Each structure stands twice: as structure tokens, then as C-alpha cells.
């Protein structure tokens, strides 16, 4: 699963998911992509599950680009722990996604196959997505 090798700070603030994506909202590498329509914290597990689904569908044909990276750590306290005593340890990693952000790009795959791959991939994501082309 994806996670950064090192970060400047171990435990970032939560922040808020307001507005639409101003960066990462256009196709750069491939001719077709999967675009997020809702804001979310996308976990590294969800990104990996989606990647596996797409690669299983297209097999060795074409090229896939992952346009998101989980660079924000989410901390959590152990269960049945009393409040206080500082912030919990980093539990997992997320990518902050705003509406309009391109999640995956693909190229060199037939129309039927890429539609099927992105359709099956969208079931692995907890948000609404849109299939876009150049």
C-alpha cells in the first residue's frame, strides 16, 4: 500500500474539504480518466483495491497512472482508552480529494475494456465518480 517514506510532521491537523479541485483536475498522462465528484479522504487501501481492479481488467494492455497519493496521516486512539493523554498514534494514510480531482488515468486500451475497468473500479470507491476523456 502507498505511504510516504518520510514527512515533515507526523500528525497533521484534520482540515476541511471545502470547494472544488483547482489542481489535478485535467488529464495529463492518459487520454481517459476517472474523476471524483465528491469530497473525501481516500485511504491507501481504497486506492490499492481500485488499482488492482483496473489492472485485473486490462491485464497487460495499455498503461495506468495513479494521480493521487496518500500523504496525510490519520491518528486514532486505541479502543476503550480514556480521553486526554495526547493525540493518538498515526493509524493509516489518506489522500485529500476534492470534487473534480482526477484519480486514475489510462491509455492504450479499447473502449469496451476501459469502460468496464473504470466501472468496476468505481464500485471500490465510496464516492460518485465520472468517466472523462480528452
UniProtKB/Swiss-Prot annotation:
Matching SUPFAM superfamilies: Ribosomal protein L16p/L10e
GO terms classed as biological process: mitochondrial translation
GO cellular component, one term: mitochondrial large ribosomal subunit
Localization, UniProt: Plastid, Chloroplast
Main location: plastid
CDD domains registered for this protein in UniProt: Ribosomal_L16_L10e
GO molecular function, one term: rRNA binding
Keywords noted in UniProt: Chloroplast, Plastid, Ribonucleoprotein, Ribosomal protein
Pfam families, A to Z: Ribosomal_L16 (PF00252)
This protein's record includes keyword DNA damage: no
Gene3D superfamilies, per the entry: Ribosomal protein L10e/L16
Highest taxon listed in the record's lineage: Eukaryota
InterPro entries for this protein: Ribosomal_uL16, Ribosomal_uL16_bact-type, Ribosomal_uL16_CS, Ribosomal_uL16_dom, Ribosomal_uL16_sf
UniProt xrefs under NCBIfam families: rplP_bact
Subunit structure: Part of the 50S ribosomal subunit.
Family under the similarity heading: Belongs to the universal ribosomal protein uL16 family.
Name of the molecule in the record: Large ribosomal subunit protein uL16c
Taxonomic source organism: Guillardia theta (Cryptophyte)
